Amino acid sequence: MYETTVRILRGDRSGTRGHQEFRAQIDEGMMVLDVVHQVQSQHANDLAVRWNCKAGKCGSCSAEINGKPRLMCMTRVNELPKDQPITIEPMKRFPLIKDLVTDVSFNYRMNKTIPPFKPAPRPADGVYRMMQIDVDRIQEFHKCIECFLCQNVCHVMRDHGHEDFAGPRFFIRIAALAMHPLDTRSRLQQLKDAHGLGLCNITKCCTEVCPEHIHITDNAIIPLKERVAGAFYDPLAWIWRKVLGKQAEQKQAP
């Protein structure tokens, strides 16, 4: 057991913010969330913190620990430098509610704009069939726990504003839908325009902070970029669409 200093950035919607220091007793195996609960219990009963499972599966306790976006419940104190304070701050890219709690409602609004899964009609025998390789491809995306650390660290969201860019979390969701072998709905136009996929310049900062180790950039964003490029910027594809469009118009003509 040893004692250390914990610096927590405190504030609320009024704009008043400042670091407050506390002393905490550190036991073997403690997580940063345990330290926050100790501070809340012994020193600052009004400290606001969002948490739920304490097992790295709910994504609730996202914060910035010593400047790095991480889950508090999965960050071991003994992995942090002992010669400096443990600095805990809320996610910087979302509006502050109070102390370590931020308003992440933008993400839920964005989620509603994504067209849902639309399966192909059932075959005559009523049984859907898929290749295992296609099923395996999208399993990684389903590991997302919606901690929104990728949204927080994405510099495009920092520079361009929330409403102009869906963010890595939702490119994962769209990739899971688009790569599903039974899905029939196209979301490419929306990706290109409303969701701003082209703004991403694949720096992989989102991949680096993902607690589920999802290869967001390589396995979701880049394949989506390739599909958008093929659909809208390939000259042969453009000519082919024009030809099909004219044929459709001729068929509809009286």
Model regions and ranges:
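Ferredoxin-type iron-sulfur electron-transfer modules in oxidoreductases and energy-metabolism complexes
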Residues: 30-42, 89-254
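Iron-sulfur-associated redox domains of electron-transfer enzymes in respiratory
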Residues: 2-107, 141, 151, 155, ...
